[in-house]
Regions:
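Hydrophobic, well-ordered beta-alpha structural blocks that scaffold small-molecule cofactor pockets
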Residues: 260-407
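N-proximal low-complexity "stem/linker" segments adjacent to membrane-targeting elements
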Residues: 1-25
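Conserved donor NDP-sugar-binding/catalytic core segment of glycosyltransferases
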Residues: 98-133
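Short aromatic/hydrophobic "clamp" motif used to bind/position activated sugar donors
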Residues: 86
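Conserved nucleotide-sugar donor-binding catalytic segment
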Residues: 79, 119, 138-233, 244-253
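A conserved acidic beta->alpha catalytic loop
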Residues: 40-51, 90
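Glycine-rich, basic loop-to-helix element that forms the pyrophosphate-binding segment
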Residues: 48-49, 65-81, 102
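Short, acidic, metal-binding catalytic loop of nucleotide-sugar glycosyltransferases
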Residues: 24-33
């Protein structure tokens, strides 16, 4: 399949500080049949971006255009590309060396050269100089994504620079909407991935920088555009798609509400809340909640970790009618405080409570916590991944919506 050419398109605006890393990562691909197009979207940095691109000479194809936004730069790249496949590398992101090779190999193995390929990716937090773990979908989401690429979009698992897209999909669905300043990517992913089977590679092939100069942080219209985008998405998803991917419209809207609450998109949150209130609960919800409760046993539940993860998991349990006894945290300054109506204790104090106990491990980095539990001879515990898998057994109860009211 080396005869299939990949066009790596790098749009850039005032990005000389990171551009060299992006171009180098594109040129260093282990897959030989690639071209690199750098689209300068009217940078106003006294020629710094142009000088950086000029260093590469004929190794890249360089285009300059008047400033029109990322969508217009990407569309120029799509018009000018000679390849069979489109790959987008933001000027502040980087491909791992074997990204293109592994994605082409996956296409060869599946036998469908027009299948869209996605992958995991890693986040590089510039201010903290921290390279995070790979962003991975949960088990239930992976099952959905194997059925329909729409699930990946609705779960915000499409980075954009992780994608390898055959050019036929632009002919089928069109290109980026140039009237959108910050949501042009997800607008297109929704159109392109809906109804499509995808390949999802469970390894990170892209490093994505998170920094203060990004458009999503600096363009004033971002929140308004996102509210409009997500309201439009949920209004367009059909009942048939909701049943296929989520089990019911009720479960679909609860998943969308969980996402909305993690964002500043208040209009979207209110819209989805209204959808839930207008629906009846699934007829089998009570029995599913009972089965869920059995997974946590009959003992007292303690949430290990009084941070963001612990609070969120506790909220998800409360939404399903499950109460914890309290929180456990190693930070002495947190101990003996009250969090969400529950006392924070040390592990030693929590284990002195009478009766059976099950510890719910909330931190993402769980190895140290599990080691601590085992050293204390605690064998009844559940990991964050196990808790999340159990929570997927049943959506929240509508009567618990009041728990989500913001102060």
């Amino acid at each position: 399949m080396n005869d299939k050419k990949i066009s790596i398109i790098i749009p850039v605006y005032n990005g000389a500080n990171y551009l060299r890393n992006a171009i180098d990562s594109a040129l260093e691909q282990t897959y030989d049949n690639c071209e690199v197009l750098v689209i300068n979207d009217g940078s106003s940095d006294d020629g710094a971006t142009e000088r950086t691109a000029a260093e590469y000479g004929e190794r890249i194809r360089y285009f300059y255009k008047e400033n029109g936004g990322v969508a217009s730069a990407l569309n120029l790249g799509i018009r000018e590309m000679d390849g069979d496949y489109f790959a987008w590398c933001s000027h502040d992101d980087m491909f791992l060396p074997d990204k293109c090779e592994k994605q082409i190999q996956a296409l060869e193995e599946c036998g469908d050269d027009q299948r869209i390929v996605l992958s995991e990716y890693r986040l590089l937090f510039v201010e903290e100089n921290l390279l995070d773990e790979a962003v991975k979908p949960r088990k239930k989401l992976k099952r959905r994504m194997r059925q329909d690429g729409l699930a990946a979009v609705l779960a915000q698992m499409v980075h954009g620079c992780d994608a390898l897209i055959h050019k036929c999909h632009f002919e089928r669905c069109g290109v980026f909407d140039e009237t959108l300043r910050t949501t042009q990517d997800y607008d297109l992913w929704f159109r392109i991935l809906r109804g499509q089977k995808i390949l999802y590679l469970e390894e990170p092939l892209v490093i994505s920088r998170i920094h203060a100069e990004q458009g999503s942080r600096t363009i004033p219209s971002h929140i308004r555009e996102c509210n409009e985008l997500w309201i439009r998405f949920v209004n367009q998803v059909t009942d048939r798609e909701m049943y296929k991917l989520y089990g019911s419209p009720y479960e679909f809207y609860w998943e969308m509400l969980d996402f909305a609450r993690k964002t500043p998109y208040r209009a979207f949150e209110e819209h989805v809340t209204g959808k839930i209130l207008a629906l009846e609960e699934p007829a089998d919800l009570e029995s599913r909640i009972l089965e869920l409760k059995k997974k946590f046993g009959t003992g007292k539940l303690f949430m290990f970790g009084a941070g963001r993860n612990g609070r969120n998991l506790n909220l998800q349990l409360m939404l399903r009618g499950i109460s914890i006894e309290g929180f456990i945290d190693n930070a002495e300054e947190k101990q003996n405080q009250i969090l969400d109506g529950k006392k924070i204790e040390s592990l030693e104090c929590a284990m002195k409570h009478p009766g059976k106990k099950c510890i719910l491990v909330s931190p993402d980095a769980q190895e140290a916590v599990i080691r601590q539990l085992e050293e204390a001879h605690v064998t009844d515990y559940l990991t964050k991944a196990e808790i999340e898998e159990y929570l997927d057994m049943a959506p929240p109860l509508k009567e618990k919506l009041a728990l989500l009211e913001r102060g």
